[in-house]
Structure formats: C-alpha cells, structure tokens
Amino acid sequence: MTIGFIGSGNMARAIALGLARPALFSDSGSGRAATLADATGGEAVSTAEIARRCETIFLCHKPKQLSEVAQALAGFSGKVVSVLAATDLGALRAAYPKAKIVRTMPNIPVQYGEGVVAIAAESDPAAEIDQLLGELGRLERVPEAEFELATAIGG
C-alpha cells in the first residue's frame, strides 16, 4: 500500500515516524515535505503526484485548505484518513465523494507506536486501515457526535 501525506507538519511527522515506512509527502511550500521525506526514506512530491500514486492519503493540512486540497485530489477513490481538527465526516464526504473516509485524531506518542487514535467512520473501515492505524497504538472508535469531546479529552 502506497501512503501519501498532504501536509508535513508535526502530526504528519508523528504518524510517518510511527508507521516507519517510506511514504510520499507534500506541503504548501514550507519545505517540510523534503525534510520529512529525508527523515523517513520517503519522497517529497506534489499533491497531484500523491493522488496518482497512493492508495491511502493522510490529510494533515490545515482544515481551511480542505476545498483547495480536494480540488487537487479530484476524483480520488482510495482511502482518505483525515486528521483535520473540527472537520466532520459530512464535510469530508462532500470533499471526497468517491473515497473511503476515516476521521481520526491521533496523539503525538503515535510516533513511538504507543499513542491513542480516536477514529470515526461512516462504516467500518477496511481491515487494512485498521491494521495500518493499529501500528500507531490503540484505536478507540468514537461516534461522530462525540468526536470533538473525545479528542479534547484524549489530547
């Protein structure tokens, strides 16, 4: 499974280190994608390249960039794993109508495989997504209606 990260900040770094495998990274011009790619044996590429080459994409950009990034990934039908704060499944579904969507909020210890990942989905995520996220630590399924509260408590 080829994994891509849109956004290469602290949470992308923690997840990428926790997964401990090469991935593709993009950023909005900060240069962090190249730094993260170097640290993980991955590759810094454009968002469009991630859409072409990846089956699973982690959304680690700023929530206000959702529409812009979704346009760059137009038609993507793989798996979207969102770590966007305050962005519910409805907004993600509207942005990615063909994708399988999982909303998550991991904490920083995921970089050591010892974190907690809150997860909400419209239906049961694919087994490979459970397995992938399970590499980061403990998965906690949370109803969408309680997601914001759970992530505030789980920090």
Q: Over which residues does each language-model region extend?
A:
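Alpha-helical scaffold segments in soluble metabolic enzymes
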Residues: N10, A14, G18, T35, ...
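Short, polar loop motifs at secondary-structure junctions
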Residues: S28-R32, A86-D88, S123-D124
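Rossmann-like NAD(P)(H) cofactor-binding subdomain of soluble oxidoreductases
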Residues: I15-L17, T40, T47-I119
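Internal alpha-helical scaffold of NAD(P)-dependent oxidoreductase catalytic cores
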Residues: A39, A91-K100, V116-A150
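Conserved beta-strand termini and adjacent loop/short-helix elements that scaffold enzyme active sites
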Residues: S26, V45-T47, T104, V142-A145
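NAD(P)+-binding Rossmann beta1-loop-alpha1 motif at the extreme N-terminus of oxidoreductases
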Residues: M1-T56
